[in-house]
Amino acid sequence: KYVGVEIAKGFVEDLQKRVKVLKETYGEASVDFVLNDIRNYEFKDCSLVTSIFTLQFMSKKDRARVIQDIYNGLNSGGGFIFAEKIDCENARLQDMMTFNYYDFKRGKFEYDDIMTKERTLRHMLKPNTWREIEDMVLNAGFKTVEQSWRNHNFIGAVAIK
């Protein structure tokens, strides 16, 4: 069974429409989307949990607790796949990565659009360094965690219980 947890009502309604199409196309797909905040969601009997650019919007305390909740809800050998924006540990490298990413985005978006999004997200994002994220995941009890993807200040990783 696949369960998606979404905090925004409009997104859940859209996702539920997509599930209807999936079921019409592939038969009785066991997919559901629930309106909830993952800080309040009870993870249980999970083989795999994914979190794509979600934890970075939480306080460090909430993030650590959610990672612990995910670990507790995973079956032995279960996986946690996640992607997050990260900060570099070195301020100079952080600036280099940030401006290099802006250059990359300018190939697809207007400068004003890039800066508007940056200003909008700046007060909401709470990125950690990779080392801080790795420590949180290992402190929750995961046996291993490895980066599987990186692009500028964004990483994807896999952790195994």
Task: Please report, for each region that a protein language model flagged, where it lies by residue.
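A short glycine-rich, Lys/Arg-flanked "PGG" loop and its adjoining helix->strand segment in the class I
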Residues: 64-76
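Class I SAM-dependent methyltransferase SAM/SAH-binding core
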Residues: 1-40
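Conserved acidic residues
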Residues: 46-47
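C-terminal alpha-helical "lid/dimerization" subdomain adjacent to the S-adenosyl-L-methionine
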Residues: 85-140
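A conserved beta-strand element that flanks and buttresses the S-adenosyl-L-methionine
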Residues: 50
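Short catalytic micro-motifs in class I SAM-dependent methyltransferases
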Residues: 53-57, 84
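Conserved beta-strand signature within the Rossmann-like core of class I S-adenosyl-L-methionine
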Residues: 77-85
